[in-house]
């Protein structure tokens, strides 16, 4: 008898939760309508009208007709009002947890535990416009801590690297997109991401990646990579940084001459598979606006000049710049370099001013925890939780590529491949 009563209560609870879950969808429709009315997103004659709604893995998509006289920009300006209005303190109970209840034990206590452990649902909102207003309500929560697993590299092809998890799911970045601006305050995830990027490239492209690492914060972050065969140079001060950048400039000039001679417009048309990644961390230590002393300032000016040239013409020649800073200010972040970096990845920054320098908008100062980043490309902006990779994982993955011997000087020759008529690098030891 007790079992039957208990079962009835549980089944009734499940039915109630299912009903509430369905009714919450219509509640969101009503809420959005009311929020828009209170925010003045109406005309005298009309307000937004629901056209359709659709359930996705990541949440709900609501499509509205907007009244004549209102623009998409009007709704974009009120996105914070829509987001805050849709969020509340109600807890969400997972029905699967109710199905796990053991009726032979204290089922009432089990229900109380399920209710007390229920999570608050923090929704996010994105807007799109294609003649209709699309309001995407993202319900999938981002992980607080995402540990790196080597298996995710299997989801990356060619020059893709794992970026992390968004509310839509797993996301990766293609290094073929061009240069990257990377920013983030101390201990917020920037250095861990750099190590993930380097490790992924060595592991995925051991035969075709070349790395020049410029670490002007002491060189310790890149120390475990310095003996990898893929690493051309590691610079830890202004003098060695200038030497490395001059070397890259010289290579680029030879590459341009070879392209011109062979009638190739860019690296893809030439069929050359090698990519040279130049990572500069920290931009403030290479900025002539920050460096003091006449000689040092001149070295910094030459470094910045070289970086500007790499950013301007390097992408088409197979060079990829990753330009990093902990302290992004207008004095530190060279405008010419930044404008040629199509991709921006930024972790939490000190204030909205720093965020605007990097992103051209505020927001990075509000990122809540380490590893949480804003990923901005010409295709749009997303919030992502990036993976944390341990030093032990790094050493295990790059160990086959470590060589404990002085690297010999190399000369480079470019020629047509015989089998598939593609072009390739011929490296001669001197």
Regions found by a protein language model. Give the residues of each.
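Conserved C-terminal "switch" segment of AAA+ ATPases
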Residues: 362-379
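Conserved alpha-helical scaffold flanking the Walker A/P-loop in AAA+ ATPase domains
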Residues: 264-270
